[in-house]
Amino acid sequence: MKTMTSAEVRQMFLDFFKSKGHTVEPSQSLVPVNDPTLLWINSGVATLKKYFDGSVVPENPRLTNAQKAIRTNDIENVGKTARHHTMFEMLGNFSIGDYFRNEAIAFAWELLTSSEWFEFPAEKLYITYYPADKDTYNRWVEVGVDPTHLVPIEDNFWEIGAGPSGPDTEIFFDRGEIYDPEHVGLKLLAEDIENDRYIEIWNIVLSQFNANPAIPRSEYPELPQKNIDTGMGLERMVCIIQGGKTNFDTDLFLPIIREIEKLSGKTYSPDSENMSFKVIADHIRSLSFAIGDGALPGNEGRGYVLRRLLRRAVMHGKKLGIQGKFLASLVPTVGKIMQSYYPEVLEKEDFIMQIIDREEETFNRTIDAGQKLIDELLVNLKAEGKDRIEGADIFRLYDTYGFPVELTEELAEDEGFKIEHEGFKVAMKAQQDRARAAVVKGGSMGAQNETLSSIEVDSKFLYEDKKAQAKLLVAIKDDELVDEVTGKAQLVFDVTPFYAEMGGQVADHGVIKNADGQVVATVLDVQHAPHGQNLHSVETISPLKVGETYTLEIDEERRSAVVKNHTATHLLHAALHNIVGNHALQAGSLNEVEFLRFDFTHFAQVSKEELAEIERQVNEVIWQSLKVETIETYIATAKEMGAMALFGEKYGKNVRVVKIGDYSIELCGGTHTQTTSEIGLFKIIKEEGIGSGVRRIIAVTGQKAYEAFKDAENTLSEVAGLVKAPQASQIVAKVSNLQDELKAAQKENDALAGKLAASQSDEIFKNVQRAGSVSFIASQVTVPDAKGLRNLADIWKQKELSDILVLVATIGEKVSLLVASKSLDVKAGNLVKELAPFVDGRGGGKPDMAMAGGSNAAGIPELLTAVAEKLG
């Protein structure tokens, strides 16, 4: 077995399959593109689903990749086990209807055992297979595997409901008896017992059958196109090759761990658990790559996952004794480890560090709040005579504030408290179940559409034409190829002026005419077929026949509106880079007839000043009437030109570059104006957040922009009339004067309210009652607003008349309730929650002051009567 670095292992895998005629697919963003079923790219095949379901046919049916992936179902296990990670790399080879079982098994055995490649000892490799899959067993024997190393496993069958399925065969490496102290041997593998001796390194899925839950598995029909999907975990391979005790004891993690040693002053040893070292090393990899790919910490979805990872890493840093912020300082080390194949971390190092640093600073403030919560919880439990912390409270501290259970235990034990673990486990399982339920299971191989996949004719899009003579090559009705169609159908022509929806630009609409100039069909939509042809969805008026020539005409007015928005989108993207920063990467776009929508990564709301500057800059470029050039060239040449490639998009060798003067240059396959002046005008309508770290701008161009400006002008005129400003330029001064007058009136009103409260207070505060050892005042009062209640409470505080004050008032149709407390035994927030239901209300607050709102004034007498009972 050869000694290799992780970079060499990755490259050898790719080089091997390249030598076998495979195309190397570049690693895609961790943030899925156009796949709502996934929170993250979670496997090597996840980015290739379009090939397996037949929606796109690859240029080469043999593919290989090294794909970064994230899985966070069991974050708690990271650091506890030898091989659990949140971010990992999958190496894979894939066949889309090309080779199958025989070649896949032969490739695997050659790569692993040949002296030219990894050179693993054959006697160290064990293979599992599906018992009924005799073909796989026989093939392994044919390539040279010792039959005693072949282990049948009933679970070796890949299946997710109805659809493509098939047996799989897994390859394990035997690390020897040193990792099998009980000398259990092959039983560990045969009975699927968790162990550190037999390590799975490769899984080969043979997608062979069309699963149907209604029939026995043995009767599943075979798929028309059989596929191969394999996955090899890079971290596991490197661990075996480098002889690490765990995956963390390799060149993928050790440089990070060495930096953590410097920060903490503590020493990592593979012979001890060192959980905190492993957690930090794992989580900083995930954070660096995910943030580099455009995901940002937040309170939901991907953002919540990143926030949780960061907080967990910070807390483990504190367990190691690291003071202050430290996580961002590890990013350069992550970048250097991975730079040979993933240069993006170093390229975006400053931005990644900025985000992590800012988030860590925020969390450090949160930690202080969490510490106070723990202290407060322990004080309350002591006061109640309890000696244990309930599981629900532990989970709240863990889930909301990121406190590891171990840290809560330590703090509790220092104060003599026990921990109720069962409640924590129940709450944790409920959260995991919710997380799993939120992800729609998407199999690696979706349903195959044979009709569309079988179409292999050429179909060319004519960029410059609005009308074209075209021969009808293919007609599809109800998923069947036909020679003549009526009603709704799908058509493919040899050429077309109709743009198929792609890259955020909507499809063209229009009509199809016969030789006599009569309209025979309306084009409702255009999409790309699996082999890339332009597939026209039409509603026919008269029958259309395959082989005949028709005139295709697009709706030019619609196209004109769409291209204005598309070209403006390029200008907006460039302006965002200039004004907000280069981290503002496109996260989605839509170029419609009425408007354009642009989503981009950014960690804060775009300020009004920034939006104004973006709008000004885009319009300035429009008025310069810059030429919009399209250049067809090689991808390498385009990148040398500085063309911006959109992350997550897949580009072939030949690409189309759209260049707008010296202002913008992007890879783009869409249609555009000839000059920027054709856009006319650009106006931003809205800027908003649509998810964690993703902002959205909606804008309009041309006539729609003019209408938007006109609407704003009309609104301004209406406001001028309301404030009696003769000219629009005087509105600001008029409104400012009105605000000053309003403040003066409010001040006078507050003074009167204070006097009213003082006049009422003597009468209200006369009736001091007792409930046990607690004195209280409970009264219904007349006040204009909630502030009046607070004024009375302020007077009560100064006079020190009782321990508790309860005031209730009807304000309009609503009920307002105030509770104030000077007693350490009675918390206002708790008492207001008990009283509010009497008036159909709810509320809360601090231990000394709390308020609630309700809707049932009829419940006020009962509420006041209940105060003594609640305090007694």
From Swiss-Prot:
How is the cofactor bound here?
Binds 1 zinc ion per subunit.
**Catalysed reactions listed for this entry:** tRNA(Ala) + L-alanine + ATP = L-alanyl-tRNA(Ala) + AMP + diphosphate
- Cross-referenced Pfam families, in alphabetical order? DHHA1, tRNA-synt_2c, tRNA_SAD
Please name the PROSITE patterns in this protein's record: AA_TRNA_LIGASE_II_ALA (PS50860)
Q: What is its main location?
A: cytoplasm
Location in or out of the cell: Cytoplasm
What EC designation does it have? 6.1.1.7
Q: Does the keyword ATP-binding apply?
A: yes
The domain of life is: Bacteria
Q: Which UniProt keywords apply?
A: Aminoacyl-tRNA synthetase, ATP-binding, Cytoplasm, Ligase, Metal-binding, Nucleotide-binding, Protein biosynthesis, RNA-binding, tRNA-binding, Zinc
The record ties this protein, via NCBIfam families, to:
alaS
Q: Which HAMAP family match?
A: Ala_tRNA_synth_B
Q: What is known of its domains?
A: Consists of three domains; the N-terminal catalytic domain, the editing domain and the C-terminal C-Ala domain. The editing domain removes incorrectly charged amino acids, while the C-Ala domain, along with tRNA(Ala), serves as a bridge to cooperatively bring together the editing and aminoacylation centers thus stimulating deacylation of misacylated tRNAs.
- Stated name of the protein: Alanine--tRNA ligase
* Native organism: Lactococcus lactis subsp. cremoris (strain MG1363)
**Could you tell me the gene encoding this protein?**
alaS
